[in-house]
Amino acid sequence: MKRRELEKKLRKVRVTPQQDKYYTIGNLQWAIRMINLMGIKCVCDEECSAAEVALIITQFSALDLENSPIRGKEEVAIKNTLKVFWSLLAGYKPESTETALGYWEAFTYREREARADKEGEIKSIYPSLTQNTQNKKQTSNQTNTQSLPAITTQDGTPRFDPDLMKQLKIWSDATERNGVDLHAVNILGVITANLVQEEIKLLLNSTPKWRLDVQLIESKVREKENAHRTWKQHHPEAPKTDEIIGKGLSSAEQATLISVECRETFRQWVLQAAMEVAQAKHATPGPINIHQGPKEPYTDFINRLVAALEGMAAPETTKEYLLQHLSIDHANEDCQSILRPLGPNTPMEKKLEACRVVGSQKSKMQFLVAAMKEMGIQSPIPAVLPHTPEAYASQTSGPEDGRRCYGCGKTGHLKRNCKQQKCYHCGKPGHQARNCRSKNREVLLCPLWAEEPTTEQFSPEQHEFCDPICTPSYIRLDKQPFIKVFIGGRWVKGLVDTGADEVVLKNIHWDRIKGYPGTPIKQIGVNGVNVAKRKTHVEWRFKDKTGIIDVLFSDTPVNLFGRSLLRSIVTCFTLLVHTEKIEPLPVKVRGPGPKVPQWPLTKEKYQALKEIVKDLLAEGKISEAAWDNPYNTPVFVIKKKGTGRWRMLMDFRELNKITVKGQEFSTGLPYPPGIKECEHLTAIDIKDAYFTIPLHEDFRPFTAFSVVPVNREGPIERFQWNVLPQGWVCSPAIYQTTTQKIIENIKKSHPDVMLYQYMDDLLIGSNRDDHKQIVQEIRDKLGSYGFKTPDEKVQEERVKWIGFELTPKKWRFQPRQLKIKNPLTVNELQQLVGNCVWVQPEVKIPLYPLTDLLRDKTNLQEKIQLTPEAIKCVEEFNLKLKDPEWKDRIREGAELVIKIQMVPRGIVFDLLQDGNPIWGGVKGLNYDHSNKIKKILRTMNELNRTVVIMTGREASFLLPGSSEDWEAALQKEESLTQIFPVKFYRHSCRWTSICGPVRENLTTYYTDGGKKGKTAAAVYWCEGRTKSKVFPGTNQQAELKAICMALLDGPPKMNIITDSRYAYEGMREEPETWAREGIWLEIAKILPFKQYVGVGWVPAHKGIGGNTEADEGVKKALEQMAPCSPPEAILLKPGEKQNLETGIYMQGLRPQSFLPRADLPVAITGTMVDSELQLQLLNIGTEHIRIQKDEVFMTCFLENIPSATEDHERWHTSPDILVRQFHLPKRIAKEIVARCQECKRTTTSPVRGTNPRGRFLWQMDNTHWNKTIIWVAVETNSGLVEAQVIPEETALQVALCILQLIQRYTVLHLHSDNGPCFTAHRIENLCKYLGITKTTGIPYNPQSQGVVERAHRDLKDRLAAYQGDCETVEAALSLALVSLNKKRGGIGGHTPYEIYLESEHTKYQDQLEQQFSKQKIEKWCYVRNRRKEWKGPYKVLWDGDGAAVIEEEGKTALYPHRHMRFIPPPDSDIQDGSS
């Protein structure tokens, strides 16, 4: 029916025959809205039929409206309106409501007659069913059984199943009293074991009294049916949904055509739904939700109430209070009329006595029979049901339809059994009284069991009693300010009206609001004078506030909340959106502020800076600085790329130095594969994020800057920042701290929404249909704090976020192209490498062609020429970045595998999901010379950590090679921290090197290297042949150079034995696979051409053959560098000069140190160039001079030192004589004299006080600073200082300090002055007991305490520096000790603490060597030669790891342990046992 036609017909129907009021479309809409409120779907549209409206009327009539807010007149009005609507749709033309009701009664009568006729036909077909129907009105089972077990057969005729009849009887008995409860579900599982789908449906519909339970079961089964249909689309092999539910088939067809699996699936669906309904019904209610039923005996109600109160965790006084009041307030109307005159303080016995006759007729009769039995009177009343109309109606009433809770709107329970209870302490949902933390007990003024509607239950478009309550801390005026207040026992929605004095409600609320009627008052308004009714002492509650007010009732179109209520609940009114305030965070500084002068700017930049400052000043981001602000930071402007607009920057380097820095909250970018899949995705960019957060008032003066005009046209303008400035070190930390709190609040309000934050970029994802509303809500929340999120910064579905391109299901890198510029500066190359590193998970190409160009480059503006390999590397990057591949996100439960591939200059890895890569990268190999296994394990640990960060779970690994090679390589690894689960794939990956253990029958090369000054010598020895090379370098480079020389000269299979652990470990771990630099790179290039290289190690200087010869060769090479000879023949004409590169490297060497041969008329001058001695030869003679190749033409003074030493030991000459006679430097001559012991004894100079020094020799003394006594001790070798504040200068305090010193450090010798506290017997005895040498200096000679005296001065300087930052002397002393012992002060070198640790390490090594020498015993052995003959016994010179060196026939030989058998040393004193 069309809307206009329906409206015309409604206006012709009178509400009552006596009045001229007619129905309108608004009355119908009101009735439909109330029907929807009760959970019944009712839609008034053009396609609505009379049958649908009749079904709605039947459902509404079956509802339990006992405690609902719509009962009485409103219930009758709703039914009458719906019946009028039905009569119009049915084709009738009612004149009034009574006429429509008559049409409805006639219709229902015809329906009952038709149903009775149909039942009669079925009974005539099955006479056996009539046997149990004669007492239908006496038993409720037969009353509730409306659906008979008539099953349609395959040919269409009904059949009777006697077993089904028994099952129906069992089900009817099980659901008679409590409906579908847990007991009934158990019975249902038994009786439906062999039933088909149609029979199960018939069984459920046979209990019309509990039709709501059946409807709930059917709705849950339909949900499972819909879910199965969706699942069936992706699983075609599964049974059809129609086969499971038996749709379109008779019972016989279901029993024959449908499989047992389908029937069992439907049966399980029904049982699961019934169990959910039963569990939802039988939740234990709290005392607040217990109400007495209309026919329930008062005794039963009190028993339930007491049982609930006993289960509460509350004080006894609270339980007594609730029992007194709830026993009256929650009683039914009959009991309340009796109990209210008695009052709440009446004893419970009197209440029970007064209400004993209240209840159903059955309970009254039972009470009367029990009373008569106690009196001994035989009851003349038969034990049958009373025949009163009320009792008969209560026992034989028709089937009850489903029940619905008007509190939460859900079916299956009533309001008194609702699970959504509230705490009776504070009135808030979500917890019980036992867990309540609120101290507000005044809310008991209002009925706390009144439910407060929530946004999840109702929507704003529903009735006024169902709108969500508005609970802000303020009231916004951008829309009508409606709020809800609990007044007089009901939630009332009203309009905030600051012009009204009182609360004015509609007249409809007069009967609903609890209060005392008062005197009516006159209201004067726009429409004139109006008389309003009044109620006083009306209790109200809003949030946590309560009170008592007067309420007026008049003919007002909307409820109004006036100032009598608003003054207690409203804090402020505002129309602005930005209402939240951001509290600035305090910032600490150390030292004075920056005072850097402003440098001059060009006129163009000055004008641009003026415009920017003007805009910032107008926006309030900066303000004028005070006249007495002495701080200043330079400011400048640059042009933005692309737009050409000017941008202001500040040089905050000085301010950043004095600012106490905070910790940034962001630990890095989120990994895009770890972002969860969702249906909707949105990215938001916050504009001017830093400029939104205020800067602390106390810190703003430190950010001052100046705008200096051109040519000093006028005074400078001074400004300071009011918000976070760009470039300041603490701006990111303060921004992250502030926004974190806002984001956390958003996440709490939307826990199912995915929200990522990285600086000012937000990523929002969800699976909700109202995703856009959530995004808008988040934007509004950010906007309330002042953060701007412009529309042009919002991206949806396919977003570009922090360098990635994301869709709800996929991700990839944003397409880009790297510019190839040749040549380019170091700075530009660094930026290019950084861009390549960013996209390496996509490209997975090693960057060594680019990074090798950056070695030893310190000048950022230096030009670099790209190599062809570098250009090719960048081109490969551009090829893959032109259109990056889309990748999947990580799914929950999916197996993650990391595949590792070895490349010459790195390790390539891929994170696989279902065999597809979703992340990857390259781990470059550094130059730490570590072995491959360590590097791979370290890489696996890093990758596992990355996957844990990305997904929260660990991954397995897929490695190249075989498990046998991997396990064999792991056995050589000594320090394994963690072994991950690994799998292997076939790949030519070699875990072991060409280098291995020493093998016999191979040529063996002994290598050694040494260093003297800056000159290094490398030597190898093999079977009497020696080769050496001198070059500038280190000890390690010399050792490696010797190995490189041996590899170049050696055969394809050879052995190399070295005494360097560094070289041995590096060679053993396959150096050819590592991209090392220098000599390692040379070795790596040579090794692939070798078949096998055996590497061994022997200790140095142990007299081992081969190693001794190599060591002597090193010494000889270093000594031979002193005589100077030309590399090529030289011919000098008279007066000719010629330059000569000697190839001699020695630190401190000078040309004057060399002496030419006496027979050569050559003048020699020169200098040191890059530590190399370069000479200039001048022929001062008259003839040609020819110097042959390798001919020594001058010698160094070093060769004269032994002769000078020997001469001095014989004649004890003075240093001056040694200088003139042997041409030595005076410093060396004095050293020769100083080392002579005879000259020391015969000296006649007076002995002054000495200043003893040495390892673990401590000097101690006391000093005073600011009236404080400080005990100081200094370790003379390292300068390590230990100090402690002591209360007085006594021997006891010094002894305690010495004990603490010994506890921390090694003390072998203590030296002090002759003070009484240091020479006391207590100190002497303590040192003697501890085994410490105790000495004292010469009296009154401060030189004997020079070290500790200098420490006094340094310590006091540091104490004065730290005094202002510390509250106590002890704290300043701790800082001073850390500064003296562990800080280098910018001068480099070792700290005193590091020098002391080296001394400790040396002491430990000496102890180990002494212990080893004591435990060393003489070893002898037998050896097996190539002919497998045993020879011996031979003495073992050295026993190593896997091999030993023996003395064989006067020569040394190396044998592996497998060819040796050790025996006890032979002893000539042991006699033969046979004698």
From Swiss-Prot:
Specific enzymatic cleavages by the viral protease yield mature proteins. The protease is released by autocatalytic cleavage. The polyprotein is cleaved during and after budding, this process is termed maturation. One of its GO terms (molecular function) is RNA-DNA hybrid ribonuclease activity. Transmembrane segments: none annotated. The record marks 126-127, 148-149, 367-368, 392-393, 472-473, 562-563, 1193-1194 as: Cleavage. Changing residue 17 to L: In strain: Isolate R29-106 and Isolate R29-Nadin. It catalyses: DNA(n) + a 2'-deoxyribonucleoside 5'-triphosphate = DNA(n+1) + diphosphate; Endohydrolysis of RNA in RNA/DNA hybrids. Three different cleavage modes: 1. sequence-specific internal cleavage of RNA. Human immunodeficiency virus type 1 and Moloney murine leukemia virus enzymes prefer to cleave the RNA strand one nucleotide away from the RNA-DNA junction. 2. RNA 5'-end directed cleavage 13-19 nucleotides from the RNA end. 3. DNA 3'-end directed cleavage 15-20 nucleotides away from the primer terminus; 3'-end directed exonucleolytic cleavage of viral RNA-DNA hybrid. Residues 1248-1400 form the Integrase catalytic domain. Residues 492-565 form the Peptidase A2 domain. Residues 130-147 have a biased composition (Low complexity). A zinc finger (Integrase-type) spans 1199-1240. Disulfide bonds: none annotated. Interacts with host light chain cytoplasmic dynein DYNLL1; this interaction is critical for intracellular microtubule-dependent viral genome transport. This is Gag-Pol polyprotein. It comes from Bovine immunodeficiency virus (strain R29). The gene is gag-pol.
